[in-house]
Amino acid sequence: MKAAIIGHGKMGREIEKILLERGHRIGAVIDEANASELDAAHLAGIDVALEFTTPDAAYGNIRACIDAGIPVVSGTTGWTNRLEELRSYCREKGGALFYASNYCLGVNLMFRLNRRLARMMERFDAYDVRIEEIHHTQKKDAPSGTAITLAEGIISEIGRKTGWVNEPLSLIH
């Protein structure tokens, strides 16, 4: 497989290392310094683009890959208010987009358990739910995509919850 890495920060470098260890090839590495190379000509021959950038850049990066006919895997968080718009564009163009706020198997199992527990708590009005997270000092987005996904899972299962606020991240009703 020949991959393009879009975003060569902490996560992008880790992805590059894993891809190379597993025998895959890196066809392009695109970050802020060469963002203008995110086009069909520079992505020719790429099998998949792995996009882990910033909230401000993600939408445009993914759209450019879709326009170039390159399937995209994205893990950038903090921009998902436009995710449905982008998924619609992707379908319209016949593209492929896979997005997750966290790619860790254990965390995705936790997402499922979270929803199940929220369903169980629906009947207990006397109890409430709160999410508090602590991260390393280099964490760029807060709340994290993982915390937001957990909050959205709770909101989807507990009818009295209508949203969340970041003071710190709390569910509201």
Give the ranges of each region predicted by the language model.
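NAD(P)-binding Rossmann-fold cofactor-contacting core
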Residues: E21-L38
